[in-house]
Amino acid sequence: MADVDKLNIDSIIQRLLEVRGSKPGKNVQLQENEIRGLCLKSREIFLSQPILLELEAPLKICGDIHGQYYDLLRLFEYGGFPPESNYLFLGDYVDRGKQSLETICLLLAYKIKYPENFFLLRGNHECASINRIYGFYDECKRRYNIKLWKTFTDCFNCLPIAAIVDEKIFCCHGGLSPDLQSMEQIRRIMRPTDVPDQGLLCDLLWSDPDKDVLGWGENDRGVSFTFGAEVVAKFLHKHDLDLICRAHQVVEDGYEFFAKRQLVTLFSAPNYCGEFDNAGAMMSVDETLMCSFQILKPAEKKKPNASRPVTPPRGMITKQAKK
């Protein structure tokens, strides 16, 4: 554990933030042992805290980042760099974008520095069979080595899965599950764990709302389900909640309501992959649980690139990853 003992968090954060004024794309190359230390120390903290977090407002909630490091820095400029504000991120830190390493390293560093004020949930891309395919593995291999990617996997397998803010706002990456009857079921999930192909943990990270579905439907992703407005209303009523806050889908304005404002989707990576013309958003929850949105506008419209592959069915990915 020598990597953890001599970890200089302040120096790491300082170097990661030094590129703030630079042209987007400039890398920060931390030492391999520093990154390993970030993974090991944050993993310890994740395991010392509940898998279902119970948080208090005020805080700011962010959706997918996907390696768009300079947009993450813009989010902090808008919302206030920690510890100025408390944060909850809803997962999908890596893959797709060009700087997954800087992104996840800054987030883990802030988790270590401010463990009671900075929170990270697991997204479906914090899973080896997914980020093996969609960019993070290749970035680790190119800039460091495969062993470091495996160290991240061990860390991701310990991330919390969901959070409840002031007993009223239920937060997770994907959405609801037909298997979820009691919050105790989430609390009983043992870590470390991979993300299974089906069941409660899979659904919390993979499911999507769908206005055209009554009850539960098939998901075009080939994994998990879709759920309709009535499912949302029943869930909130049963658990005495006001709102579901989730990420997992690109939405044009960075945030989008569903089911009469009983669910909100947040997406925090503007111009996603350089191919979408979407804004990014961050939701601020004040002490009275009033929610407002800060928007990161997209850059000037670019020609969409039709060549980006969609996420294929889960089974297919798993098979590819085993090669």
Curated annotation (Swiss-Prot):
One of its GO terms (cellular component) is nuclear speck. Mn(2+) 2 binds at residues 92, 124, 173, 248. Its cofactor is Mn(2+). CDD domains: MPP_PP1_PPKL (cd07414). GO terms for biological process: cell division; glycogen metabolic process; mitotic nuclear membrane reassembly; protein dephosphorylation. PROSITE patterns: SER_THR_PHOSPHATASE. Binds 2 manganese ions per subunit. The active site is at 125 (proton donor). The keyword RNA-binding does not apply. Its EC number is 3.1.3.16. One of its GO terms (molecular function) is metal ion binding. It comes from the Eukaryota. Keywords: Carbohydrate metabolism, Cell cycle, Cell division, Centromere, Chromosome, Cytoplasm, Glycogen metabolism, Hydrolase, Kinetochore, Manganese, Membrane, Metal-binding, Mitochondrion, Mitosis, Nucleus, Protein phosphatase. SMART domains: PP2Ac. Residues 300-323 are annotated as: Disordered. It holds the Pfam family STPPase_N. Its main location: cytoplasm. It is found in: Cytoplasm; Nucleus; Nucleus, Nucleolus; Cleavage furrow. InterPro entries: Calcineurin-like_PHP_ApaH, Metallo-depent_PP-like, PP1_catalytic_subunit, Ser/Thr-sp_prot-phosphatase, STPPase_N. Mn(2+) 1 binds at residues 64, 66, 92. It catalyses: O-phospho-L-seryl-[protein] + H2O = L-seryl-[protein] + phosphate; O-phospho-L-threonyl-[protein] + H2O = L-threonyl-[protein] + phosphate. Belongs to the PPP phosphatase family. PP-1 subfamily. PP1 comprises a catalytic subunit, ppp1c1, ppp1cb or ppp1cc, which is folded into its native form by inhibitor 2 and glycogen synthetase kinase 3, and then is complexed to one or several targeting or regulatory subunits. Protein phosphatase that associates with over 200 regulatory proteins to form highly specific holoenzymes which dephosphorylate hundreds of biological targets. Protein phosphatase 1 (PP1) is essential for cell division, and participates in the regulation of glycogen metabolism, muscle contractility and protein synthesis. Promotes nuclear envelope reassembly by targeting nuclear membrane vesicles to chromatin at the end of mitosis. Acts by dephosphorylating membrane proteins such as lamin B receptor (lbr) to regulate the binding of membrane proteins to chromatin. This is Serine/threonine-protein phosphatase PP1-gamma catalytic subunit A. The gene is ppp1cc-a.
